[in-house]
Amino acid sequence: MHIIKPVWLTHGGKLVVHDSSSSWHGPLTPTLLSTGERKDFEVYSCDVSPDGSRLVTAAGDGYVRIWSTEAIRNTDDSSQKPKQLASMSNHSGTIHTVRFSPNGKYLASGADDKIVCIYTLDANPPSHSTFGWSYDSSILVSVGLDSKVVVWSGHTFEKLKTLSVHQSHVKGITFDPANKYFATASDDRTVKIFRFTSPAPNSTAHDQMNNFVLETTISAPFQNSPLTAYFRRCSWSPDGMHIAAANAVNGPVSSVAIINRGSWDGDINLIGHEAPVEVCAFSPRLYSTQPPNKQTPDNQGQAVTVIACAGGDKSLSIWITTNPRPIVVAQELAAKSISDLAWSPDGTCLYATALDGTILAVRFEDGDLGYPMAMEENEKSLTKFGTNRRGAGITETTDGLLLEEKSKAGELKGVEGRMGALMGDGHASAEATVNGKALSSNGAAPAQGTSPTADAQKTQTNGTTTPAAQEADKPDPYQAKLERLKQRPTYTKDGKKRIAPLLVSGAGAAESSLPQARLMASVSSQVKADTPQSIVDLSKPFDGLPKGGLAALLFGNKRKLAQLEGDEDGHVEKRVALASQNGATPIMANTPDGLLPAQPQPPATGQQQTPEYIRPAVTNPCMAISQLRLAVPKVRSQIVRAIDSTGKPTEPPGASSEANKSRVDLVFEARNPSPASLTGRAVDREPVRLTLFRGEQPLWQDFLPRTVLLVTGNQSMWAAACEDGSVYIWTPAGRRLVSALVLEAQPVILECNGPWILCISAVGMCYVWNVKHLSSPHPPISLQPVLDAAVHTLGAHPSSAPAITNARINSEGRVIVALSNGEGYAYSPSMYTWQRMSEAWWAVGSQYWNTTEAPVGNLQSTDSQDKDAKAAVSAGIIPFLERNTTNETLLRGRAYFLQRLIKVLLSREGYESFESSVSIAHLENRLAAALSLGAKEEFRLYLSMYAKRIGAEGLKNKVEELLKGLIGGKHRDLQRVTVPYAKLLGVVDESEAGDAMET
């Protein structure tokens, strides 16, 4: 092993002269070196190009420098070969990270100036804190000190998604070589694993709203890790089995935690460094323990991985998986901490940079680490994970770039053909799938002059047909179907023969225009929706509704015929007897003499087991005349509301894991007494005890004489809803904020979000209160309109209404309701009516429906906390409702019948533009919903999609109308239209908008 440290390999700094009376800031010369010393800039990062020919470094001088690795390895060579290949200065601050893309085409750098620079290798060249590239170069992920993880497209460099899941600085990122996950390390003492699917080259932020999902959070190895480390650069092993996480601790000792894939735990720690380890780097190659001359095809030796670690103790350690101790420990390699490590692609050289400006290389001889195995062994070890590494390992050159341009041209033709088929272009569809020329994998047709027969003959070797030739010999199923349909004869009653007409759009690829695949994809996605890490401006449900939603009954205006007196008595007796059998407390006792008032039950003796449900709630008499009745929750012995330190609801300590118990901050508990009476009288029961705990310590306690059905609360207040329809509200210190609020029926849903409380009663009335201002934004509203009450009011018998699957409130006090029929509603306090935001019609008729389920919010970064709060208003509500529509539509099997309806409509005359019209209408509905809810980021996205679509469709009138509404004109009426758009888009602030309306 050789450590190479060339004198010229540095980011040269200024000359510091020991004489304080003079200083020199010009070029360094040997003469000046004798009277002073040169202070090199700190080097923060390094990386090696995929072909191993270039080393890139970044330092505090604001320069990105590219060096020749050949010159570094051969420092004794006296030839005048170039050493520094390039020097780029496009940043105004210290550059903290540089990374080559795995295909070698791009170089990314990030600095303190909050700018990410992407440098590209041109085929015809003219005279942030940390990044990571995916292994197929499809995405670039940047992390920084703002605690956000930003995903960029590796093709267009557009921002695809911002993940705000960390609570502190993010200082490390690594990608899974199987291209399924990436991991980030943060100063919040966690490593978070994200699952992703490589986006297509033309993907947009809207397409990827449901990609990049948080898989798990790892915190155990880092609970007491120091926060002084400058980096937490982790690394993924080349076989995909392990993650090496820097800055871990094992007791009081600094270590490197080895995390196992899948289970995301680990009991292996690399211990040996005296200071925190700031960077880990696995060698990109697998190594064999046997030399090549002793390897056989059946026995190539044990495959091992090699990892290098360095950090604040200025030492470098090299570990092999078969040894419990490091094979090499090099100390005092630099005067300050080692900041980054980078391996050459062949695994024979390791480069390191340090904060004192040191850049060095460590060259290994054959057998020092083992014997590098072929890259095919890496791919073989990754096949068990189902790798999807499109384009991985292909180093870009000028010739390769020219070939890529030709490939893209062929791919573009294939895309145009498929888009023509999807949009109902019969000519394009027939050209792409019906004629004899099959498309290649990139969408390009075979070259002219070649036939399928000739191609099949070319694939034969020694008289044996290859699988490719066998695949080419298989008949096209769409072509066969088309041939069967072409000459299908039918006979009329009089014996005449007719040929059935063939709809061109009904065969081949035209079937894919129906959105069936989009709906089914959402079922296969196993993603936990609405996780605490998701950004969605809705109250978090803590006391889940029954499976299938909260049941509702609708009663018509017509009444049943009056029953005879005897029948009525018999009916009452049966009802009372049945209620007694079910455990209900009888109001009337069925005796031999008839129905008599029930006598008080004697108190039970001995120790009694506390049941989960004590009894059904006693319903209010007003429900007997209400046309809408919602299911009332049973009386439970204990009702608990737990929140974490951020104020978000979480699982109570008794039902959570040990890891979750540590996150519980406050617990609000209501204990209902048993039905037994203390004095023998039914009215003399124990009071309900309400207690607020922090850990095991009670903070305050109160008592109520009424049975509690529901509780809710956050860091702003606590509330309890009682069986008699009263609602009590307390401050965080336990002071009663208002007198009891009395409703007309029992509360069935109680939610809160900030200072807002949502309460829904058993007769379907929605109440919204602001406890900060002790006010309500609107009068009580009924749920009857959203439960199809208008359809059922003429019936003589009760009918089941759609169940309520979600009823929540956002940070502005807007009520959001989702139903089991897939529809989603929001109440407009300015128009005093419900608005339908989502329905199943869009799911099967629109081309813009979501493809998969995942977290439902996405916020862009803003400069201030106030702007963050404004940007978060109503964030993710529209995707949340649309996801509920997809789930409920598929759950109840409505998608099949709706798609059959769409298919029949597409075959009829006059419905040629059906899909286009429905898609545009869906975008208009989204746009209006985002404007009504005040969802800033969704409005930006939907407005861009809508403008592109109506422009592509050539809808001149709609384009002019949209521009007039956005830009405005000389008339005040147009200005009134413009101001709401400008406020929502953030063009003007609230105060400026008010001044604009007054002028």
Swiss-Prot record:
Record localization: Nucleus
WD repeats (start-end): 15-54, 69-108, 130-169, 172-211, 233-276, 279-339, 343-384
Region of interest (Disordered), residue spans: 439-476
Main location: nucleus
InterPro entries: CAF1B_HIR1_beta-prop, HIR1-like, HIRA-like_C, HIRA_B_motif, WD40/YVTN_repeat-like_dom_sf, WD40_repeat_dom_sf, WD40_rpt
Biased segments, Polar residues type: 439-468
A single GO molecular function term of this UniProt record: nucleosome binding
SMART domains from the UniProt entry: WD40
Keywords from the named record: Chromatin regulator, Nucleus, Repeat, Repressor, Transcription, Transcription regulation, WD repeat
Presence of keyword Cytoplasm: no
Biological processes per GO annotation: chromatin remodeling; DNA-templated transcription; regulation of DNA-templated transcription
Cellular component GO terms, alphabetical: chromatin; HIR complex; nucleus
Protein family membership: Belongs to the WD repeat HIR1 family.
Task of the protein: Required for replication-independent chromatin assembly and for the periodic repression of histone gene transcription during the cell cycle.
Name of this protein: Protein hir1
Organism for this UniProt entry: Aspergillus terreus (strain NIH 2624 / FGSC A1156)
